[in-house]
Amino acid sequence: MTQITTQQIDTIKEIISKYKNLECVECAQAIQDYLISQKIPGKRIKLYTGSAIGRNSYIYDETVSKNAISLNGRHQGIEIIIDEVEMIFDNHHPDGITKAQWLINLLFYDKLYHGQQFQ
């Protein structure tokens, strides 16, 4: 298994700092391109609420802001295993967040009120 260095994590943080809210696809692509160039294993995680329109098209992350982080029901991040922990890096988490916590923090209407999960 390839280990990721502190310097490489700092580079990922720099990449992420270039992306704003609603730019998760572009951010994930930039991180993925960097990981490939460094031969660091990672996995692109694509979430979908099941609806690109209507109230389920809005995804929120309560740890980020009160504004929606997605308007089309989709959000993406990159999973990197660091010290045997699945960490997610996206345009809102430059320091990374555990995959479990990331999935808990991301909300949409039917998840909040009806227990639906991402597809």
List the predicted regions and their residue ranges:
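A structural boundary/capping signal
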Residues: 1-119
